[in-house]
Swiss-Prot record:
Gene responsible for this protein: trmFO
Cofactor(s) it depends on: FAD
Record protein name field: Methylenetetrahydrofolate--tRNA-(uracil-5-)-methyltransferase TrmFO
EC number from the UniProt entry: 2.1.1.74
Compartments, record wording: Cytoplasm
Family: Belongs to the MnmG family. TrmFO subfamily.
């Protein structure tokens, strides 16, 4: 019998990792600090407790990236998707679950596994004699363990709050109004002097935009989050409240830029978007971290010239979320470069969302099991949802864009993380498509490619350890 692998954290990611390891015939010790020590957001001692929404979002694999991820995890015998399907509630096209039933299902499955030992109690540091560890403690990692992780990774490599700017699909930006240009045409590392997409506003548009920011309905911080405002990362609406011209001297300053469509007309303000992933399919709105409610964000940001038809891969936010600078401190197998005994899984790696966290837990569990058994593991192709998500958090970000370093930010799975299609998007008759019709077909083709490629990966011996026939 192989020696056990320790998994710290009994949330969705930790439970999934433990399940995958046990399915490979390897003993697991799963550590969960609750109920000995709880958090302000948890209310029970169950594993995989859902502390926010009870929705796993869209379940349609033909038109949503998260639906593709659901499909892939079902194919790979995910405990979390089993629990969700067995506790499903009516929610239209979404996968919503009964919280208590879901958590009880996961807890019962973990306790019933003869290869998983559930240990209740806080882990405050990593013992030297543990040779394989997965840390899956999530956004509410205890202060003591967070301090230990911080010491292992370096003070600058563990963030305690997300400052999320909205991310827009590049192909939804109207380039008849927007243009590419870096401020003063500056060429930075990896750039060409035209690294930003610029959207111009006249005075009337700017004033209406500022008013919309101030009057828009905001999301309040949860009591346990506190208010983490600091000058380097203020929500854009807080900046707007400091004075009507503040944004024109901050993220919306128009200096050093010339409207390529109207060179003689000086914009009153400019919104800049910066490439957000290596594929160039996603662009983030620079300096636009916000606590506006999502519907308010969509309506207001679509008043910006060039973004009238914008589709958002992610909307802005600011909330507590402990996460690593994964591309810097972890390797491609999510092992800590400074101490390869340690792997990380879930939200602490920089993925965002219940299912994404569980998906990374699934992969990390398989990676750890293969390593314990001396087997090879090849990650799923980047054309799959699991592969695209793993690639983004390990290698898909933009490390530098101008003179300064680029911060790594968490991301949900979305179609912008998938490599572009190589074939032309045309109707069965060969007709060129536009607008929503083109977008729908593109999603179907990406979904079909993901399904084919995942199936091919699943049949290869390097996709993970062979599950036990029965437990």
């Amino acid at each position: 019998m192989p020696s056990p692998i320790h998994v710290i954290g009994g949330g969705l990611s930790g439970a999934e990792a433990a399940w995958q390891i046990a399915k490979a015939g390897i003993p697991v010790i799963l550590h969960e600090m609750r109920p000995d020590r709880s958090t302000p957001a948890h209310h029970s001692a169950d594993l995989a407790e859902l502390v926010c929404s009870n929705s796993f979002r869209a379940d349609d694999a033909e038109s949503s990236a998260i639906g593709i991820l659901h499909r892939e995890m079902r194919r790979l015998d995910s405990l979390i998707l089993q629990a969700a399907d067995c506790n499903r509630l009516p929610a239209g096209g979404a996968l919503a679950v009964d919280r208590q039933g879901f958590a009880a299902f996961v807890t019962a499955a973990i306790k019933a596994s003869p290869l998983i030992t559930l240990v209740r109690g806080e882990v405050t540091e990593i013992p030297a004699d543990w040779d394989q560890i997965i840390i899956a403690t999530g956004p509410l990692t205890s202060e003591t363990l967070a301090a230990h992780i911080k010491a292992l990774t370096g003070e600058d490599d563990l963030a305690f709050f997300d400052a999320i700017a909205p991310v827009v699909y590049r192909d939804s930006i109207d380039m008849t109004k927007a243009w590419f240009q870096s401020r003063y045409d500056k060429v930075g590392p990896g750039g060409n002097g035209a690294d930003y997409i610029n959207c111009p506003l006249d005075k009337e548009q700017y004033q209406a935009f500022v008013e919309g920011l101030i009057q828009g309905e905001k999301i309040s911080f949860k009591e346990w989050e506190g208010t983490p405002y600091f000058n380097g990362c203020l929500p854009i609406e807080i900046m707007a409240e400091r004075g009507p011209e503040t944004l024109r001297h901050g993220p919306m300053k128009p200096v050093g830029l010339t409207n390529a469509h109207a060179p003689t007309v000086k914009p009153y303000a400019i919104v800049q978007l910066r490439q957000d992933n290596a594929l160039g399919t996603l662009y983030n709105m620079v300096g636009f971290q916000t606590k506006l409610k999502h519907a308010e964000q969509i309506a207001l940001f679509r008043t910006i010239p060039g973004l009238e038809q914008a589709r958002f891969a992610r909307l802005g936010g600011l909330h507590r979320n402990i996460f690593l600078n994964t591309p810097k401190v972890l390797d491609m197998r999510l092992r800590l470069k400074a101490d390869p005994r340690l792997r990380f899984a879930g939200q602490i790696t920089g993925c965002e969302g219940y299912v994404e966290s569980a998906g990374i837990g699934l992969l990390v569990g398989r990676m750890a099991a293969c390593e314990r058994l001396g087997e090879s593991f090849v990650p799923p192709p980047t054309t799959t949802a699991l592969g695209a998500l793993l690639n983004h958090i390990t290698a898909g970000h933009i490390e530098t864009i101008d003179a300064g370093p680029r911060s790594f930010q968490p991301m949900n799975v979305n179609f912008g993380l998938f490599p572009p299609l190589t074939e032309k998007i045309v109707s069965p008759e060969g007709k060129r498509l536009r607008g929503p019709e083109k977008d729908q077909l593109k999603k179907r083709l990406l979904s079909q490619r993901a399904e084919r490629d995942l199936e091919a990966w699943c049949t290869a011996p390097t996709c993970g350890p062979t599950p036990l026939a029965a437990e």
